[in-house]
From Swiss-Prot:
Keywords (A to Z) from UniProt: DNA damage, DNA repair, DNA-binding, Glycosidase, Hydrolase, Lyase, Metal-binding, Multifunctional enzyme, Zinc, Zinc-finger
Needed co-factor(s): Zn(2+)
SMART domains attached to this UniProt entry: Fapy_DNA_glyco, H2TH
Name listed for the protein in its UniProt record: Formamidopyrimidine-DNA glycosylase
Note on cofactor: Binds 1 zinc ion per subunit.
Keyword Transport: no
PANTHER family reported for this sequence: FORMAMIDOPYRIMIDINE-DNA GLYCOSYLASE
Gene name per UniProt: mutM
Lineage, uppermost ranks: Bacteria, Pseudomonadati, Pseudomonadota, Betaproteobacteria, Burkholderiales
Active site: P2, E3, K58, R264
Length: 275
């Protein structure tokens, strides 16, 4: 699934292309996404300028004068710029057509979303998909104290607590394993048992890992590409544990282990990461 670095990389790629430009047409070839695309959405947005782009967690935000379009890339989706004369391929479900550019949503599994939040419903942060999200990892308020306060009394494993997104957003399955390795924390450790210093190390690891991923254009394991069609390079360059089961830890040489938590694969070093 595209995680925060992939979504932010996409936003940075499309922002100079569409901000200030008028959307001439929204072409919906397949409305049956995770939630149905509203039938009136093309008429609501035709000939309307994009005022700004944004992101909340893993959601892309396209701001118009009368509301905000919420776009989620699902499990395997991508949003990229294509040539004006490029024919759609299989699984190319939505086009944003501007005078000199087309953005195309490709989503083989149709787990993504293209939704609309009118200004009359209040700020977009109050949308049901966004209102329960935790703090952004690069918010100055996010630190060890923040994590320690939000993890207090939680019996769930720290890996699961990160994935839930209530304490901090954007740490998906790939980066959760990487962050915990960087912090030296066993992913099975109950979140509520982490000391304040260990929470501080984890907060620092989250920021550093996501910053590295952003600098590398995100991660590409199977489907993700950026706005220009380029794959992310983080996984090939930086991955310490993810999908390295049985291989030697890059730090101590101990074989990396794999386990399943909440039906998701977790990777860790049993020597470097302590409970």
């Amino acid at each position: 699934m595209p995680e925060l670095p992939e979504v932010e990389t996409t936003r940075r790629g499309i922002d100079p292309v569409i901000t200030g430009q008028t959307l001439r047409r929204l072409v919906v070839r397949e409305p049956r996404m995770r939630w149905p695309i509203p039938a009136d959405l093309p008429s609501l947005l035709t000939d309307r300028p994009v005022l700004a782009t944004g992101r909340r967690g893993k959601y892309l935000l396209l701001r118009f004068e009368h509301g905000v379009q919420i776009v989620h890339l699902g499990m395997s989706g991508s949003l990229r710029r294509v040539a004006m004369d490029e024919a759609p391929r299989k699984h190319d479900h939505v086009d944003w057509v501007f005078d000199h550019a087309i953005l195309r949503l490709h989503d083989p599994r149709r787990f993504g979303a293209v939704l609309w939040h009118p200004n009359t419903d209040g700020p977009v942060e109050a949308h049901p998909l966004l209102i329960g999200l935790g703090i952004e990892p690069f918010d100055p308020r996010f630190d060890g104290k923040w994590l320690h306060d939000h993890f207090r009394d939680k019996r769930v494993a720290v890996k699961q607590a990160l994935l839930a997104g209530h304490a901090v957003v954007g740490v998906g399955n790939i980066y959760a394993s990487e962050c915990l390795f960087r912090a030296g924390i066993d992913p099975r450790t109950p979140a509520g048992k982490l000391s304040r210093p260990r929470c501080e190390r984890l907060a620092q690891a989250v920021r550093a890992t996501l910053a590295d991923a952003l600098a590398s254009g995100g991660s590409t394991l199977r489907d993700y590409v950026g706005a220009s069609g380029e794959p992310g390079a983080y996984f090939a360059i930086h991955a310490a544990v993810y999908e390295r089961a049985g291989l030697a830890c890059r730090v101590c040489g101990t074989p990396i282990r794999r386990l399943v938590q909440g039906q998701r694969a977790t990777y860790f070093c049993p020597h470097c990461q302590k409970r």
